[in-house]
Amino acid sequence: MKANNSFSLTIPSKSNNEAFARAAVAAFVTQLDPTIEEINDVKTAVSEAVTNCIVHAYRDTIGKIYITAQLFADNTVCIRIRDAGCGIEDVKQAMEPLFTTGGGERAGLGFAVMQSFMDTIRVTSRVGKGTTVTLKKKISLRVKADA
């Protein structure tokens, strides 16, 4: 299916860019007229994915985070967040709740949070090459009231 609209954004993996990425994607998704809950779901999932890039993919270095979002005729949004960082050795294990490579401060809930807020999440990764997180959510069609 061909996207009706799309946008791309590339940002440095700095923690202060996480809020910008979240807001940019949320603003783009408003074209589908989401509920407050739906927009918050998208913002939370994007925040978790971008934070994973900052904390895990590049660790103590600065790299690029590539974000694309697409809107489809069936009111679905597809968001891809990609890095060219260290990659994930075992994606299945990494997606288990409480698994973390980030040390004591990290809760290991990022992927679980993304899964709880989005309809589908797909993670592909190659060690030494990077990771792509694909998030999809169908935004409910709302009946417009006559003015």
Which residues does each predicted region cover?
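A short, mixed-charge helix-start or loop-turn motif at secondary-structure junctions
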Residues: S6-T10, L32-T35
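Conserved polar catalytic motif of the HATPase_c/GHKL fold
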Residues: E48-N52
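STAS-typified acidic loop motif
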Residues: S8-A19
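Conserved beta-strand-loop-beta-strand hairpin that lines the nucleotide-binding pocket
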Residues: M1-S8, C53-A147
